[in-house]
Curated annotation (Swiss-Prot):
UniProt short sequence motif Histidine box-2, positions renumbered to this chain: 141-145
Position of sequence motif Histidine box-3: 222-228
Organism, scientific name: Danio rerio (Zebrafish)
Entry keywords, A to Z: Endoplasmic reticulum, Iron, Lipid biosynthesis, Lipid metabolism, Membrane, Metal-binding, Monooxygenase, Oxidoreductase, Steroid biosynthesis, Steroid metabolism, Sterol biosynthesis, Sterol metabolism, Transmembrane, Transmembrane helix
Domain of life: Eukaryota
Residue ranges constituting the Fatty acid hydroxylase domain according to the UniProt record: 113-247
Pfam families assigned: FA_hydroxylase
Protein known as: Cholesterol 25-hydroxylase-like protein
Localization per Swiss-Prot or TrEMBL: Endoplasmic reticulum membrane
Function of the protein: Catalyzes the formation of 25-hydroxycholesterol from cholesterol, leading to repress cholesterol biosynthetic enzymes. Plays a key role in cell positioning and movement in lymphoid tissues: 25-hydroxycholesterol is an intermediate in biosynthesis of 7-alpha,25-dihydroxycholesterol (7-alpha,25-OHC), an oxysterol that acts as a ligand for the G protein-coupled receptor GPR183/EBI2, a chemotactic receptor for a number of lymphoid cells.
A cellular component term, taken from the record's GO annotations: endoplasmic reticulum membrane
EC number(s) on file: 1.14.99.38
Residue positions of motif Histidine box-1: 126-130
Length: 251
């Protein structure tokens, strides 16, 4: 409790900046690119370094700078054209309020798990529908499947509808569950990290799916199969929904 309170007190020193309508967009872009950067370096080095290349899921696939810039440009475009205006509307309609007291550690862990599990379910339903209904796939989701070999900067390579609808789930869940603002920030960071890791294209020894037991979590190999085959592994993170609906495949 003391540690979290100290961190939260430090964050609240910048409360004026946190209340700015620019903050959500800058926070999202900064965190996202920070998480992508290590994998961009791996992509740049893997053709020359066998030690890195051995962890690449699709050994023969390569990532060009043109592909990276294309993905980065679309991500920045979506943030500026769509996310920022919505951030301004949210700032006007529902001003952010910050509690002085930090949450307890156990409460943070519980709320993070709840937000993540709820998002995982919402994403699964959304994703399944956008693959099973041809019009939805062609109109909205096909752009995300331009690349059949995943890489980190392809995480946010998507059209306006996909960006906004999945962003809506991520934004509304902390409000629905009534979590602390600190937990909400942590959830957005965790959600972005897991999404980038899903698309990174590497099966690293310390990856989340290797740390979580009993095959509960799919990770990068799980999502890479989805980008190759299109008709399986619809849940973004956990495997229980795909197991239940018979859509879980390992290769």
């Amino acid at each position: 409790m003391f540690g979290l309170q100290h961190i939260w007190d430090c964050i609240l020193q910048y409360e004026a900046q946190l209340r700015s309508p620019f903050f959500p967009v800058l926070f999202s872009i900064t965190v996202y690119l920070s998480f992508c950067l290590p994998f961009v370096l791996l992509d740049a080095l893997s053709p020359k370094v066998e030690l890195i290349r051995r962890y690449k899921i699709q050994q023969k696939a390569s990532v060009s700078w043109t592909m990276m810039w294309s993905c980065l440009a679309l991500s920045l475009y979506n943030h500026v054209v769509y996310i920022f205006p919505l951030s301004v509307l949210h700032w006007y309609w529902r001003p952010v309020s910050y509690l002085a007291e930090a949450p307890g550690v156990l409460r943070v862990v519980w709320d993070l798990a709840a937000c993540l599990l709820l998002f995982d379910f919402q994403y699964f339903v959304w994703h399944l529908l956008h693959h099973k209904v041809p019009w939805l796939y062609r109109t909205f989701h096909k752009v995300h499947h331009k690349y059949t070999s995943t890489f980190a900067l392809a995480t946010e390579y998507s059209g306006a509808w996909e960006t906004l609808s999945l962003g809506f789930f991520a934004a509304v869940n902390p409000m629905l569950l009534g979590v602390h603002p600190m937990t909400e920030m942590l959830f957005h960071m965790l959600n972005m990290w897991l999404s980038v890791e899903d698309h990174c294209g590497y099966d690293l020894p310390w990856a989340t799916h290797r740390l979580m037991p009993f095959g509960l979590y799919g990770g990068a190999p799980h999502h890479d199969v989805h980008h190759q085959k299109f008709k399986s592994n619809y849940a973004p993170y956990f495997t229980h929904w795909d197991k239940l609906f018979g859509t879980l495949h390992f290769e």
